[in-house]
């Protein structure tokens, strides 16, 4: 017997009148039926016409088009989200490719910078250091009781924009919007959180409208103890939640992940999500070329936690294809602002020290100084893949790309830094410098490039291809942890969905219009791997399929029936 989806059953609610209209998760606006208007004391509070959600979407989209500035469009969409969440997600679903860059990167970066200026209405939790004694009470104050996914930031490394203080809240809000729009996770189950530990950004500290704690960032033991107080409070309030760390500074991101990954179900999207989507793209590119990843040589510009996280995932895949750990690491070249990471560089972080090149292997290289530049790496190591996670614009110069193309007929070039203003090279330039031969994937959205009358689609190596599917898979399987194997399976599942890998042509990654189907597929593979790893509580395949469909939320209005508190 086919089970009735939850969305088809009536929802019993105690709210009525203006209070109901002020509740974004429940508000239908003009779509309340005549019966509901009578039952919930709404007559006179709404215009006479009873509309369908399709009619509401049409009006909202017309209003959206009236805004010419992307930031204004972002503010408008956020206002709908804070008024009527079902309408917001139906509108987003109807225009996903067009609106994703507005609700998330690159537009969300500007929204974070101006968060205190454009603030309209509270969403999520602002947990400040001065109120640290009340964290349990703050979590109890959340308007959502059955939270299944939390995205938390401390606002210190927002995209490529640095310290934005509580302005970083725009990132958890945007990320969770994509969990719902792309992964079908009900907005009733999501909670954005910002840990307000101060800010070192003088613009924020000196801004009379800044809404956060006006204090330099706390560090060291104070910081670690505060984060731990938050984590322990979350475990008490929602012990089975999936917690995603987002946009923490390099000095904190990896230590926090390592500290808590075996304590609760958590992952860091900047490290693990970026690595997973990048690896999926590289597996797809290798398949399209009839090769394996173990045959490639990879150079990185940017050796922070994100870059090193990607490198470790690539190494794991190379090892699964037959290389030893030593052989795989010999194919990875990490360059940061001090040059190539080698055993001669002092003060390397632990995760960087695992990715150094030994000096004796570089003895024959032609270099000008001990600080080996990216250009010198390209000339000597002859990489077939170039990945940028530096957060600095224009560092993939014409000389570097042309030098790479000399020894690699079809180089893969991935300038992943975002927002768009921080990209290492623009796709149009890369295509031109390689005579149309480069395979390009970027971190921010770019329009297709036309070169010599041929159109080149530019894949956006966007984490939204990965994390919504991981989230849905974790929730459906009841996974207690996010393991490395689950992330690896997510990468391979994404590669399975690549039009280029399957057909030899077309874009490297699926169209954003297909992202819901991609997320469902990734969720299924992740959930199955959770079973294999022994971290799932749903153990049968049939129950797993049912759980994925049951947990996949659609933006449709439910029939309301009244109940009392």
From Swiss-Prot:
Record GO terms (molecular function): malate dehydrogenase (decarboxylating) (NAD+) activity; metal ion binding; NAD binding; oxaloacetate decarboxylase activity
Keyword Lipid metabolism recorded: no
Site (Important for activity) location in chain: 270
Keywords: Metal-binding, NAD, Oxidoreductase
Cofactor(s) needed for function: Mg(2+); Mn(2+)
Residues bound to NAD(+): 157, 270, 418
Listed SUPFAM superfamilies: Aminoacid dehydrogenase-like, N-terminal domain (SSF53223), NAD(P)-binding Rossmann-fold domains (SSF51735)
Active-site residues, Swiss-Prot/TrEMBL: 104 (proton donor), 175 (proton acceptor)
Catalysed reactions listed for this entry: (S)-malate + NAD(+) = pyruvate + CO2 + NADH; oxaloacetate + H(+) = pyruvate + CO2
GO process annotations (BP): malate metabolic process
Cofactor note: Divalent metal cations. Prefers magnesium or manganese.
EC numbers, comma separated: 1.1.1.38
Positions of transmembrane segments: none
Quaternary structure, from the entry: Homotetramer.
NCBIfam families in the record: PRK13529.1 (NF010052)
Entry protein name: NAD-dependent malic enzyme
Source organism per UniProt: Proteus mirabilis (strain HI4320)
Gene responsible for this protein: maeA
């Amino acid at each position: 017997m086919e089970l009735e989806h939850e969305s088809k059953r009536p929802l019993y609610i105690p709210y009525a009148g203006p209070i109901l209209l002020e509740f974004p998760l429940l508000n239908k606006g003009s779509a309340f039926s005549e019966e509901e208007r009578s039952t919930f004391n709404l007559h006179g509070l709404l215009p006479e016409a009873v509309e369908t959600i399709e009619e509401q979407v049409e009006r909202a989209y017309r209003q959206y088009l009236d805004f010419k500035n992307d930031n204004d469009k972002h503010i408008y969409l956020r206002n709908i989200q804070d008024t009527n969440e079902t309408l917001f997600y139906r509108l987003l679903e109807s225009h996903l490719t067009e609106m994703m860059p507005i609700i998330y990167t690159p537009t969300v970066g500007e929204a974070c910078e101006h968060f205190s200026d454009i603030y309209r209405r509270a969403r999520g939790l602002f947990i400040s250091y001065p109120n640290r004694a009340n964290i349990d009470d703050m979590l109890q104050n959340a308007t959502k009781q059955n939270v299944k996914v939390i995205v938390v930031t401390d606002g210190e490394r927002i995209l490529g924009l640095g310290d934005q203080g509580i302005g970083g809240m725009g990132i958890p809000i945007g990320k969770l919007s994509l969990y719902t729009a792309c992964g079908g996770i009900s907005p009733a189950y999501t909670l954005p959180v910002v840990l307000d530990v101060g800010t070192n950004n003088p613009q924020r500290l000196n801004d009379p409208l800044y809404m956060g704690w006006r204090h330099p960032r706390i560090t060291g033991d104070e910081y670690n103890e505060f984060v731990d107080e938050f984590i322990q409070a979350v475990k008490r309030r929602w012990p089975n939640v999936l917690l995603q760390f987002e946009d923490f500074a390099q000095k904190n991101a990896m230590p926090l992940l390592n500290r808590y990954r075996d304590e609760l179900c958590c992952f860091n999207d900047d490290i693990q999500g970026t690595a997973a989507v990048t690896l999926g793209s590289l597996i797809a590119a290798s398949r399209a070329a009839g090769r394996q990843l173990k045959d490639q040589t990879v150079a990185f510009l940017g050796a922070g936690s994100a870059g090193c996280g990607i490198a470790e995932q690539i190494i794991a895949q190379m090892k699964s294809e037959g290389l030893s750990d030593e052989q795989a690491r010999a194919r990875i070249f990490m360059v940061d602002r001090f040059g190539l990471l080698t055993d001669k560089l002092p003060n390397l972080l632990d995760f960087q020290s695992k990715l150094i090149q030994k000096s004796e292997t570089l003895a024959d290289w032609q270099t000008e100084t001990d600080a080996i530049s990216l250009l010198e790496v390209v000339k000597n190591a002859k990489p077939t893949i170039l990945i940028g996670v530096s957060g600095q614009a224009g560092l993939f110069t014409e000389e570097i790309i042309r030098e790479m193309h000399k020894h690699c007929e079809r180089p893969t070039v991935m300038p992943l830094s975002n927002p768009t203003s921080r990209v290492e090279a623009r796709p149009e330039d890369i295509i031109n410098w390689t005579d149309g031969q480069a395979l390009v994937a970027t971190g921010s959205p770019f329009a297709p490039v036309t070169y010599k009358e041929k159109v080149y689609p530019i894949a956006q190596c966007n984490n939204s291809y990965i994390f919504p599917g991981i989230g849905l898979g974790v929730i459906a399987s009841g996974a207690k942890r996010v393991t490395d194997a689950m992330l690896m399976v997510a990468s391979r599942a994404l590669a399975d969905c690549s039009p280029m890998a399957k057909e030899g042509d077309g874009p490297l990654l699926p169209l954003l219009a297909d992202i819901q189907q991609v997320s469902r597929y990734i969720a299924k593979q992740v959930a199955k791997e959770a079973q294999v790893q022994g971290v799932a509580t749903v153990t049968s395949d049939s129950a797993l399929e049912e759980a994925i469909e049951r947990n996949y939320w659609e933006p449709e209005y439910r029939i309301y029936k009244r109940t009392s508190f």
